[in-house]
């Protein structure tokens, strides 16, 4: 392994967990990526966290295919075995 992107190559066609700026996360199957860390996921679940009046709420949506701009990505990992898209923050 020579670069961090080599880790992504190992996870092509595998489920990945991606944390984005703006209190958003995605779990989906990694289909493609480039050197700017732009990512394409299929069968993705996006979770958006919002803090309203000191109460944390989350909304979820499913996407058949989604493109993620690389400059919004803060973390990429494999999801835990019981991960259904929801994570604790």
Swiss-Prot record:
Name where it's found. Nucleus; Nucleus, Nucleolus; Cytoplasm
Q: Does the keyword Repeat apply?
A: no
Q: What is its main location?
A: nucleus
Question: What Gene3D superfamilies does the database record attribute to this sequence?
Answer: 2.30.30.100
State how changing residue 21 to E affects the protein, per the record: Sensitive to thermal stress. Decreases binding affinity for U6 snRNA
Name one matching Pfam family.
LSM
Positions of the Sm domain? 3-82
Gene Ontology terms for molecular function: RNA binding
GO-annotated biological processes: deadenylation-dependent decapping of nuclear-transcribed mRNA; mRNA splicing, via spliceosome; P-body assembly; rRNA processing; tRNA processing
Tell me the SMART domains matching this sequence.
Sm
Annotated keywords: Cytoplasm, mRNA processing, mRNA splicing, Nucleus, Ribonucleoprotein, RNA-binding, rRNA processing, Spliceosome, tRNA processing
One GO term of the cellular component aspect?
precatalytic spliceosome
* Record's keyword annotation contains Ribonucleoprotein: yes
Could you give the subunit structure recorded for this chain?
Component of the heptameric LSM1-LSM7 complex that forms a seven-membered ring structure with a donut shape. The LSm subunits are arranged in the order LSM1, LSM2, LSM3, LSM6, LSM5, LSM7 and LSM4. Except for LSM1, where a C-terminal helix crosses the ring structure to form additional interactions with LSM3 and LSM6, each subunit interacts only with its two neighboring subunits. The LSM1-LSM7 complex interacts with PAT1; within the complex PAT1 has direct interactions with LSM2 and LSM3. The LSM1-LSM7 complex interacts with XRN1.
Function description: Component of LSm protein complexes, which are involved in RNA processing and may function in a chaperone-like manner. Component of the cytoplasmic LSM1-LSM7 complex which is involved in mRNA degradation by activating the decapping step. Together with PAT1, the LSM1-LSM7 complex binds to osmotic stress-activated mRNAs to attenuate the osmotic stress response, probably by limiting ribosome access to the mRNA and consequently translation. Component of the nuclear LSM2-LSM8 complex, which is involved in spliceosome assembly.
User: Which family is annotated?
Assistant: Belongs to the snRNP Sm proteins family.
Misc. comment: Present with 7060 molecules/cell in log phase SD medium.
The protein's name in its UniProt record: LSM complex subunit LSM3
Source organism (scientific name): Saccharomyces cerevisiae (strain ATCC 204508 / S288c) (Baker's yeast)
What lineage does UniProt assign to this protein's organism?
Eukaryota, Fungi, Dikarya, Ascomycota, Saccharomycotina
Gene name as annotated: LSM3
């Amino acid at each position: 392994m020579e670069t961090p992107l080599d880790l992504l190559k190992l996870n092509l066609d595998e489920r990945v967990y991606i944390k984005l700026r703006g209190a958003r996360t995605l779990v989906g199957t990694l289909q493609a990526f480039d050197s700017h860390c732009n990512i394409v996921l299929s069968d993705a679940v996006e979770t958006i966290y919002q803090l309203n009046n000191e109460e944390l709420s989350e909304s979820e949506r499913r996407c058949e295919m989604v493109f993620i701009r690389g400059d919004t990505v803060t973390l990429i990992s494999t999801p835990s075995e019981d991960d259904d898209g929801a994570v604790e923050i």
